[in-house]
């Protein structure tokens, strides 16, 4: 939303071709590779357990069967498998690209007050995951036969689209005031996320949904942390040429980094676990290690293939 809204005047097909095709082909290629990986481990004689080491969500259900890989590949047009969990975001991204030209037409005509009203209603919708957990599963007209409740048309990631567009106009606050507000917002969001997740993690009866509730992306605590980063970055000025080049390269490689990184999560967890670091250290060390490896691989692909790498890495 910060970069693309409002969408510039162009035919609908031109926008879709430029945006969707750029993510569609890498998405399909990497989805197939992730789903063929279990079969490949069997071809080269590796034990079946290595699949669970790479992809934790399939532990206990590992299969090196080619037919099982083909079944998962056949499901790509409908949903992701547990071997490429991170692809959930690409299905979402394609949906946002489909929606964006229509949303942009409203943004072009809406005044600041109308955008603010939309954002406030969206903020209210962010409490729905918690209300659904602690008040009632069915809220505001939803039922087994109707999943579209009162706030449905304001809910979801389109709020982040509008938020990005709204905050890119900047603010007149001083650097100190902006950083203080960002710190308070981030601390508030992080404390809710950490406290809720920790409580679920220490509860033997907690379900997978309980574990994930407090880092649901469309929730008020995640919004607080996201907005904090948005506001803080607005005050950052980068003038060092080497850093500018590095950031530009990261931007270029960003989609490829995302495509590749899930192959590295399991091995990185096992590798860094051998160093007996405290958990608060393991997580950032693992994140940095995965990022650098994925960035290096993606940059290498661009160096070898040039512009053709876009079809594979995005």
Residues of each region from the PLM?
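Hydrophobic cores of alpha-helical transmembrane segments in multi-pass inner/ER membrane proteins
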Residues: 1-2, 92-100, 155-165, 223-233, ...
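Juxtamembrane transmembrane-helix termini
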Residues: 1-19, 30-54, 237, 264
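Hydrophobic alpha-helical segments with transmembrane-like composition
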Residues: 5-6, 38-45, 52-137, 147-169, ...
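Membrane-interface helix-boundary motifs at transmembrane edges
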Residues: 8-18, 103-115, 167-180, 236-248, ...
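Aromatic-anchored segments of alpha-helical transmembrane domains
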Residues: 31-32, 121-134, 184-199, 257, ...
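Juxtamembrane "helix-exit" motif on the non-cytosolic side of transmembrane helices
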Residues: 131-141, 194-207, 268-275
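Alpha-helical transmembrane segments and terminal signal-anchor/GPI-anchor hydrophobic tails
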Residues: 172-248
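C-terminal "closing" transmembrane helix and its immediate cytosolic amphipathic cap
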Residues: 236-251, 262-314
């Amino acid at each position: 939303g910060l970069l693309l809204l409002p969408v510039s005047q162009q035919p609908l097909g031109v926008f879709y071709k430029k945006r969707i095709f750029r993510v569609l082909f890498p998405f399909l290629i990497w989805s197939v590779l992730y789903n063929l990986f279990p079969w490949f481990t069997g071809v080269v004689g590796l034990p079946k357990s290595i699949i669970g080491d790479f992809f934790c969500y399939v532990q206990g259900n590992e299969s090196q069967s080619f037919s099982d890989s083909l079944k998962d590949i056949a499901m790509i047009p409908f949903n992701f498998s547990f071997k490429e969990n991170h692809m959930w975001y690409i299905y979402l991204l394609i949906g946002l690209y489909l929606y964006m030209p229509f949303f942009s037409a409203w943004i072009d005509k809406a005044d600041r007050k109308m955008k603010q009203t939309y954002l406030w209603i969206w903020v209210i919708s962010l409490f729905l995951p918690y209300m659904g957990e602690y008040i009632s599963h069915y809220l505001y007209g939803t039922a087994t036969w109707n999943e579209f409740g009162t706030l449905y048309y304001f809910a979801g990631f389109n709020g982040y689209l509008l938020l990005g567009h709204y905050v890119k106009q900047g603010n007149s606050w001083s650097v100190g005031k902006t950083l203080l507000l960002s710190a308070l917002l981030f601390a508030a969001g992080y404390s809710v996320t950490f406290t809720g997740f920790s409580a679920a993690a220490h509860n033997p009866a907690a379900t997978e949904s309980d574990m994930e509730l407090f880092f649901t992306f469309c929730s008020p605590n995640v919004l607080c942390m996201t907005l904090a980063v948005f506001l803080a970055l607005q005050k950052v000025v980068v003038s060092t040429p080497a850093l500018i080049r590095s950031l530009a390269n990261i931007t270029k490689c960003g989609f490829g980094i995302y495509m590749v990184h899930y192959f590295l999560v399991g091995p990185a967890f096992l590798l860094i676990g051998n160093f007996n670091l405290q958990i608060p250290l393991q997580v950032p060390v693992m994140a940095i290690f995965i990022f650098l490896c994925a960035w290096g691989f993606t940059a290498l692909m661009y160096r070898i293939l040039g512009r053709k790498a876009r079809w594979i890495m995005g």
